[in-house]
A protein has these predicted regions:
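Phosphate- and other anionic-substrate recognition elements at nucleic-acid/protein interfaces
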Residues: 1-186
């Protein structure tokens, strides 16, 4: 049984999702930590790291380290100034806030796997566990095939769920890149 903890770091909210990897991933626990202020400070960082510890340690035996979940964290892209093919102004505070949360998580858990951003949390609603789809999102007749939206707080947990699902493949790619990288001879 392999457990993966996915984290979607953000300035306004951070999503956390713990899954058991099976042919159909099973959501074991999730949380969304919302930032109550307009800035990313030590209180928010402490709340994020506390929630990660609570979820992570609640699902394995810490005395012998058996079954410890692997961690996958969504990385941050360089800003492009475009969103959905249109010019989009960039809020530097939001980008810096995401980077601060990402840095805090990586400092606390340096063995985390980085997952590239892009598309996380935007799969069809039916691809997510029922806990990650609100009743309002299920109202339309075609809800199951629609791509997940950005209108609810739970979107952060959906993104973390996708990050956790991608963790193993990103870890394999990182290992292969390390093995095939030629180091200069001394």
């Amino acid at each position: 049984m392999t457990l993966w903890l996915g984290i979607d770091p953000g300035a306004d909210g951070t999503g956390i999702a713990l899954i058991r990897l099976t042919p159909v991933p099973v959501l074991l626990d999730h949380d969304v930590i919302l930032n109550d202020t307009s800035e990313v400070g030590t209180v928010y960082i402490a709340r994020v790291l506390g929630a990660i510890d609570r979820i992570r340690c609640g699902h394995f035996d810490a005395t012998n380290d058996s079954g410890r979940p692997r961690m996958a964290v969504e990385a941050v892209n360089s800003p492009t100034g475009f969103a959905a093919g249109k010019r989009h102004p960039i809020d530097p505070a939001h980008l810096l806030g995401c980077a601060i949360v990402l840095g805090a998580v990586l400092a606390a858990y340096p063995d985390s796997v980085l997952v590239p951003p892009g598309g996380n949390g935007h799969g069809a609603y039916a691809s997510y566990p029922p806990e990650l789809v609100t009743a309002g999102e299920r109202r339309r007749a075609d809800w199951a095939t629609r791509p997940a939206g950005q209108s609810t707080t739970i979107r952060h947990a959906r993104s973390a769920f996708d990050v956790a699902r991608q963790g193993p493949s990103c870890a394999r790619r990182a290992r292969l890149a390390h093995l095939t990288r030629q180091e200069p001879l001394l």
